[in-house]
Amino acid sequence: MNKKSTVDLIHGPILPALISFALPILLSNIFQQLYNTADILIVGRFLGQDSLAAVGATTAIFDLIIGFALGVGNGMGVVIARLYGARNFEKIKEAVAATWILGIILSVLVMLMGFFGLYPLLQYLETPAEILPQSYEYISMIVSCVGVSFAYNLFAGLLRSVGDSLAALGFLIFSAIVNVILDLYFITQLQLGVQSAGLATIISQGLSAILCYFYIRKSVPELLPRLKDFKWNKALYVDLLEQGLAMGLMGSIVSVGSVILQSSVNSFGAVIISAQTAARRIMAFALLPMTAISASMTTFISQNFGAKRPDRIVHGLRLGSYISMAWTSFACVFLFFASPSLVSFLASSTDGYLIENGALYLRISSVFYPFLSLLLIYRNSLQGLGQKLLPLVSSFIELFGKIIFVAWIIPWTGYTGVILCEPLLWLVMTAQLYFSLSKHPWIKEGKKLLATGGKS
């Protein structure tokens, strides 16, 4: 294993280890966001507002697909991180072999569902008729190549599961640059239209997947299975599938709620769609440090769970919460003042109505970011502890809450209801996850050990 890029999450001071592990994840997330932001900036600037709205109208579907792929990859990585914490290297190879087989099967199923269901779904979401063809062109490209997203997220999840969050960063930076170059070339030189933005994203993710594979082959060979490792192990397959689907479905359930909410956004017309698209992209960037810390908690807790260190789990949980809360408080203040300028820049527009609504979205939702930070920390911690059902409960709370808002509240309050929907649900979900986590026996044991100065 490449020790230089691998962070030891089981031994030594926790804060430096968490920061060292989370920083490459943060930078990776930044460049991951650049995939979509490059699409938005280039599409809006060179193809016009209708094309921008066409991409924006598919945001929830895009998040549904990519979120599922990311969740499955990270979920299976949780199992491998637990095995790595226990230093069970033979079982790790079997687990990796199983993730490859399951990844192929899930990719085919998602592609088939997308092939038959995409156009009716866009119609159900009340996508405006003038942008419907472009929306379908863009998102159908993403869905037809979903296997590429699965491959990259599986490989990146493997690297993170053993504490190597740095390696995937270099590959992702390279592919993000390629994505921007291809966007510009396809749209401005070949004039291929909005579909080419999706093609550029797929090619870029494919490069990341290929580079990750060759890095693992050279530097982390213990992650590569042998032919004899491709064997049926019911308990292992069930564990991987349950954890992978739990995290994949969690992201998908959240995204289904977003798809439902998107139908309300689409009903307000192309200008509001563009405002929402720009505001959501800014929000995603503002929350990147928080999401990096919460993502690192999954691996940290899973490895220490395998190593039987409840004291480190509780200590790490506290430190992660403090860091995340501090950042989101800063982001709230920053967005209050900078929102109008940021929305105008990202939407490539001086339309006062668009800027006003995009800025309003950011100013209201950012007040609730500290609660969102705790929500993600608690949920990822439960996943790291191997809990499958409790994190899903929070996702169902969000789904049903969005259905209630779309059916009864937004028709009465208008776009303000769209803005308030998610923040109010964050409060409920955070409370549910806090009580679920605090009752976990490992958290109770870790608190006792820290209170008495003991060590597991």
Model-derived segments and their meaning:
Residues 52-112, 149-168, 276-339, 372-386, ...:
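Small-residue-rich hydrophobic transmembrane alpha-helices
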Residues 114, 157, 183, 212-216, ...:
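Structural signal for membrane-spanning alpha-helices in multi-pass inner-membrane proteins
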Residues 73, 141-160, 168-176, 197-212, ...:
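Short runs within selected transmembrane alpha-helices of multi-pass transporters and secretion channels
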Residues 1-22, 80-145, 191-245, 301-367, ...:
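Short alpha-helical transmembrane segments in multi-pass integral membrane proteins
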Residues 20-39, 141, 152, 175, ...:
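Transmembrane helical elements of multi-pass membrane transporters/channels
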Residues 25, 29, 41, 78, ...:
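Transmembrane alpha-helix boundary and packing residues in multipass membrane permease domains
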Residues 11, 15-34, 38, 61-68, ...:
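Residue-level signal for short hydrophobic patches within transmembrane helices
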Residues 30, 34-53, 122-129, 185-192, ...:
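Helix-terminus/linker motif at the lipid-water interface of multi-pass membrane proteins
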